[in-house]
Every structure is written in C-alpha cells, then in structure tokens.
C-alpha cells in the first residue's frame, strides 16, 4: 500500500525550494508535473448550534488528487468530487460540471459560513527518487510567505517501517540544510486502505501541519 507524510518548514525563505532541489539532485531519477494545494478555514455564523459542535470547518484541495475537495469537521471528513458520473448525465439529473464545495461555501452559503483563512501553494515541483515521490511547494497566506511544504509518498511496495525510515531521512536532509523547525505528520498504521481513506489521511496531514 501507499503511505503519505507532510512536512512543513516555517523558518525558511521562498528560495529554499531551489536549495532543496540542489540537495535532492544526487538521488533524483526524474521530475514530475507541477502541482498545487489549498487549505481553507471557514467559521460558521449560525446561531443556536450545538455547543459541543465545533464552529470551524476546513477544506483541502490537491491538484494531483483530481482536485477533489476534502471537507473536515468534527474529526469527520467527506470528499466532494469535481466530476459527475455518466449515469447521472444519461438520466438527465445534472448538466455541466459541479462547483467545488468550497466555492459554494464562499459564494452561496456565505450567510452561514465565512472564510477566515487560505493557505495555498501554486506551481509546486514534483521529484521522483529511488525511494519516494516528493512534492515541494511554497505556502502563502493572505499575509505572505508562510513556509515550505513537502509531501512524501511511498512506493506501493514499501512497508510502514521502510516509509518511516525515509521520512526520517528527509528530516535529516533538511536538518543538514539548517532547517530544524519542521512540523511532521505521517501515516502511522499499517494495513490495507481504500483510496478514499488515503486521501482523507493525506488531507488530515496537511491540516495538522498547517492548521
């Protein structure tokens, strides 16, 4: 199965991404497609809600995961796809393509949900090494540069122990660059996963290091 981890480096500059590429060049097999991500935070303005119910909701969208939106609230998550099945078209149930869920929150449900924050990265770089797929991106918010994001993806043949060693190796590499202030969130359990479950976990990793 495939394991994921997300690392966030705060005390760095936008040019750190170039320095990282130089360090990775010794292990680099190939470079992949550009990619982007966005984490949005919403807060409800609805009255008379359950006092035990959190007023905050997050959405995570990753371009390399079909731009599907993962919505996280109360430690539960759903995926809203950006496609419609052929059967729904054939039945005349829908026309056109669905709007992203976070777009509906911001534009059609703005009387209930107010967007409070957006952290995103565009034109990220993907690297393939012998052991990992590594996606790197600069993270920005409304106030400017926030830090460097690294998404790690194991080979499907790796076990959890091998992946954890590779995560630690990347942390050591960052430390060698003078980057020791690193937040890390990665898969910790071993066993078969459904594709949706992997995307839920990956979105949760982004939220943990950026939230």
From Swiss-Prot:
List locations, semicolon-separated: Nucleus
Family, according to the entry, reads as follows:
Belongs to the Mediator complex subunit 20 family.
Would you name any one GO CC term? mediator complex
Q: Quote the protein name from its UniProt record.
A: Mediator of RNA polymerase II transcription subunit 20
Binding partners and assembly: Component of the Mediator complex.
Taxonomically, the superkingdom here is Eukaryota
What's any GO biological process attached to this entry? regulation of transcription by RNA polymerase II
Question: Which species does the entry assign this protein to?
Answer: Kluyveromyces lactis (strain ATCC 8585 / CBS 2359 / DSM 70799 / NBRC 1267 / NRRL Y-1140 / WM37) (Yeast)
- Provide this UniProt record's keywords sorted from A to Z: Activator, Nucleus, Transcription, Transcription regulation
């Amino acid at each position: 199965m495939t394991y994921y981890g997300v690392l966030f480096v705060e005390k760095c500059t936008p040019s750190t991404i170039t320095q990282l590429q130089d360090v990775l060049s010794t292990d680099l097999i190939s470079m992949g497609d550009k990619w982007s991500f966005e984490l949005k935070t919403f807060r409800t303005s609805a009255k008379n809600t359950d006092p035990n119910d959190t007023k905050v909701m997050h959405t995570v969208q990753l371009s390399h995961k079909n731009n599907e939106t993962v919505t996280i609230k109360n430690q539960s998550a759903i995926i809203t796809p950006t496609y419609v099945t052929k059967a729904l078209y054939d039945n005349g149930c829908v026309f056109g393509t669905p709007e992203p869920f976070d777009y509906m929150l911001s534009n059609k449900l703005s009387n209930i949900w107010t967007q409070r924050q957006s952290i995103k990265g565009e034109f990220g770089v993907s690297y393939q090494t012998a052991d990992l797929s590594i996606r790197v991106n600069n993270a920005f918010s409304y106030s400017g540069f926030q830090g460097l994001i690294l998404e790690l993806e194991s080979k499907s043949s790796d076990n959890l122990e091998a992946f954890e060693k590779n995560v630690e190796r990347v942390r050591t590499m960052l430390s060698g660059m003078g980057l020791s202030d690193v937040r890390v969130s990665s898969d910790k359990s071993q066993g078969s996963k459904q594709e949706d479950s992997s995307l839920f976990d990956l979105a949760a990793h982004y939220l943990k290091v950026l939230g």
